[in-house]
Amino acid sequence: MSEALKSLPVYVVDDDESIRDSLSFLLEEHGFNVTTYEDGPSFLNTADIKVAGCVVLDSRMPLMRGQQVHEYLIAEHSSLAVIYLTGHGDVPMAVEALQSGAVNFFQKPVKGNELAEAILVGLNASQSKAEKSLHEEAYRSLTQREKEILCLIIEGKRNQRIADELCIAVRTVEVHRASLQKKFSAKTVAELAYVYGLLN
């Protein structure tokens, strides 16, 4: 599982080139797919913030502080996990970062193994969040009839019973069921039930 997670993007955003280079080297040694940026705007203008991944942010940078980058990610409903690094950390700053949803907060210099573990935790959470976002988007795209049929499928009712309850043809139920499975990338009723459970 960690190998699949490690293929997800990890972004390092720090204005200090030597720190970017050392973190990039360190994280690549741990098998991560790393891209570095020297400031918040270049990261936000280039990286795909809608996909699963993790961003390691310096809290104090020119142009945009790490907290401002994080606020932007939250406002844009990004799935990226956030880890803060700081050279001048204090307890209130760490508490604020964690309350805003950051995975962790480290003071420089950071131990490689600790950062790698935090990134794996972040990537796992980010992947779950990205999947949930996709499912929520799929749910919003459902017609009212598809929502009714989905609820009845989740209740364990068969096609004929659903058709009888909704006064529609069995073939119509089959078409809607196929559409639901396609929209949620679910091959079985169990997978549909799992997705439905995530949404509720």
What role is predicted for each listed range?
Residues 90-92, 110-119, 165:
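C-terminal output helix
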